[in-house]
């Protein structure tokens, strides 16, 4: 149990200065380098930036990004990460909401951002080597101060900045370390971009434990041949990703325990872990434990979790997302806000110390999504779920991924789940096609098919629909199935449903 994230990382540097904190494709950086560099940057930021203002940090999957994050935290600033693979308009959209006084260029900005101080990479590199160390941590981020702000997409196209405090992060890190049994010195894959809160799942627990982050930049993950050649060389103990990324790795027949002898932990979050993916991982990695977790960005990475064992896979065609972490209460409520009985579907309400204070500079959206229960903060998740008597939770989809077709309410993720069970289908995502009156006219599925002997897509579709028809009501069967070699992913590694919706409704 730690009581401060910043001092816990500094303690590792004091006790194990030569230990490797970060490994970027073979270039290694020690905890001593992380501490000295972040201390010098903190001194520089304390002199250069207005007090306590959040600061945008633009860059990729590099050690410099982590050093800047820590330097900002030590000097009392929240950081707002923007990944280099974000569209250019993302930078201006975030700045329009955040009004930050400065942007730190770890990588060069692709566009000009007027009326804001730009701290460029040469200045950073000079400061991290020569600037005086920060004299003390008395102004460092602590308690309810914002530690980071991650922007998620908003329904109006205007992104929402989720404010995560030091205490929110502390609650998450302590739970992650204790519940998932991670050991000191853990070697963890660092694949999600820092603008995606899943990255926090590997970043801070690993550093607090004196472990090593093995960066996996997008240039590697985008090329399957390079990816499959790189992964076995990393010597991983811990794998953190979306299930979609693991499904890519599973395309490589060599992705198994023999070639990854030290891999003991799979931690999944960000989207639904399907039964057959879990089964394949359990089969291929008998010495590893597969953890399924769940949590909106607004509740700091994840608030539920459990080990997915062979018994769980056998018992539940649709896997549970686990139990609430010990310091958190989760309720399932109906549309009137009343708690429902065990097994009844409703919306998840999350109350506890890792729930955000709200959206940056957006009191209206904050008031709609957040509430107080005594001294605790609560969040309306917009996620549908059921809960058993003993508190095990099953995710059932999004309230905003519900569509009505011919009067029937359909969960798109429910259709996906069942399509993914069809023997001919490797991966599928279902989207609505709207008519000119903006009503749903059709369900269309995009699918990656397994190798098969059908003479045409039409014959394959007939077989898929016949098998699917044994699992779901007729009205849930997509009218069309479009086959692709792969489905588009967002920058965060999730299936890009919005891109598919746009494609069928252009």
From Swiss-Prot:
Alphabetically ordered keywords of this record: ATP-binding, Cytoplasm, Ligase, Nucleotide-binding
GO cellular component: cytoplasm
Binding site for ATP: 152-153, 292-297, 383, 395-398, 494
Catalysed conversion reaction: holo-[D-alanyl-carrier protein] + D-alanine + ATP = D-alanyl-[D-alanyl-carrier protein] + AMP + diphosphate
Gene Ontology biological-process entries: lipoteichoic acid biosynthetic process
Pathway of action: Cell wall biogenesis; lipoteichoic acid biosynthesis
Binding-site residues for D-alanine, renumbered to this chain: 197, 301, 494
Family affiliation: Belongs to the ATP-dependent AMP-binding enzyme family. DltA subfamily.
Record-linked HAMAP family: DltA
Protein name in UniProt: D-alanine--D-alanyl carrier protein ligase
Organism: Lacticaseibacillus casei (strain BL23) (Lactobacillus casei)
